[in-house]
UniProtKB/Swiss-Prot annotation:
Residues the record lists as binding ATP: 92-102
Naturally occurring in which organism (per UniProt): Clostridium perfringens (strain 13 / Type A)
Pathway note: Isoprenoid biosynthesis; isopentenyl diphosphate biosynthesis via DXP pathway; isopentenyl diphosphate from 1-deoxy-D-xylulose 5-phosphate: step 3/6
Family matches, as Gene3D superfamilies: 3.30.230.10, GHMP kinase, C-terminal domain
Superkingdom, natural source: Bacteria
Family according to the record: Belongs to the GHMP kinase family. IspE subfamily.
Record-listed E.C. numbers: 2.7.1.148
Pfam families: GHMP_kinases_C, GHMP_kinases_N
An MF annotation (GO) of this entry: ATP binding
Classification lineage: Bacteria, Bacillati, Bacillota, Clostridia, Eubacteriales
Gene: ispE
GO biological process: isopentenyl diphosphate biosynthetic process, methylerythritol 4-phosphate pathway; terpenoid biosynthetic process
Its job: Catalyzes the phosphorylation of the position 2 hydroxy group of 4-diphosphocytidyl-2C-methyl-D-erythritol.
Name this polypeptide is given: 4-diphosphocytidyl-2-C-methyl-D-erythritol kinase
């Protein structure tokens, strides 16, 4: 059984506090984009969970979130059968686009159908939260306000068909490390989430592009100054606004039209030769 597992960007990311377990309390606007991995799962003749992937640098053992999802799903519903999971990877790894989380989300949804468990999306999201804070959102997808550590999800009016160029530099970033180095007391200006939501409801891409904000840039851009150059190059190439997604290092920019986006894409691809560059669009939701 096959399914597309879509990437996400953060249109806003704010940290407003910290829990006793050191997880940050967040307010984020998440958005699905039309860049996806393909997850294919079939039952196996034994009780093993095996993972294969078209990219050699993706771990295929218990470190992979898709593997963790399969283990948790089997434990939760007392399933003995094994599964073979194939991941066709297109979403960049360690990029701040929820590549691992969206794979885990797809595994839960597929196994729910494959084994005729018929668990509700809410139950799947509860299992997903044990894997990672982005997994519940990845199960739901679309345009959403995510709060708590990311598990409190309020769907928003779809902000679809917005053109963006996405650039993932040729290095990864540790999400854990970024959050460890984030000092909430040093955040001078918090994100105007309500203003952004209002603008998105009014389909005001210009306001959104100029006012989107990610407080994790304070950490990641300090360590990787090339990201500032990428943002500046995107703006010079005609972007309405550019920002880092999640903990980074991926940077994305919104564009008014496809021609400008195409030119920016060509320029960025030429300048940042060892980076992954994509043109994509925001989409309404997953096809879960």
């Amino acid at each position: 059984m096959k399914m597309k597992a879509y990437a996400k960007i953060n249109i806003a990311l704010d940290a407003i506090g910290k829990r006793e377990d050191n997880y940050h309390l967040l307010r984020m606007i998440m958005q699905t984009v039309d860049l996806y991995d393909v997850i294919d799962i079939e039952k196996s003749n034994d009780s093993n969970i095996s993972i294969s992937c078209n990219k050699h640098y993706v771990s295929t053992d218990e470190r992979n979130l898709a593997y963790k999802a399969a283990v948790l799903f089997r434990d939760e519903f007392n399933i003995k059968d094994g599964v073979k999971i194939n991941i066709k990877k297109n979403i960049p790894v360690a990029a701040g686009m929820a590549g691992g989380s969206t794979n885990a989300a797809a595994v839960l949804v597929i196994m729910n159908k494959l084994f005729n468990v018929n668990a509700s999306l809410e139950v799947l999201k509860e299992i997903g939260l044990k894997i990672g804070a982005d997994v519940p959102y990845c199960i739901e997808g679309g345009t959403a306000l995510c709060e708590g550590i990311g598990e409190i999800i309020t769907p928003l009016k779809p902000f679809e068909n917005k053109i963006l160029v996405v650039l993932k530099p040729n290095f990864g970033v540790s999400t854990k490390e970024v959050y460890t180095n984030l000092d909430i007391n040093k955040i001078r200006k918090h994100v105007n989430i309500e203003g952004l939501i209002q603008a998105m409801e009014n389909d005001d891409l210009d306001y959104v592009s100029k006012n989107m904000k990610n407080v994790l840039e304070n950490v990641t851009l300090k360590k990787h100054t090339i990201l500032k150059n990428i943002k500046e190059d995107m703006r010079k190439s005609g972007a309405l606004g550019a920002m880092m997604s999640g903990s980074g290092p991926t940077v994305f920019a919104f564009f008014d039209d496809m021609l400008t986006a195409q030119r920016a894409f060509e320029f960025l691809k030429g300048k940042y030769k060892y980076s992954d560059v994509y043109i994509t669009r925001t989409i309404n939701s997953n096809n879960l």
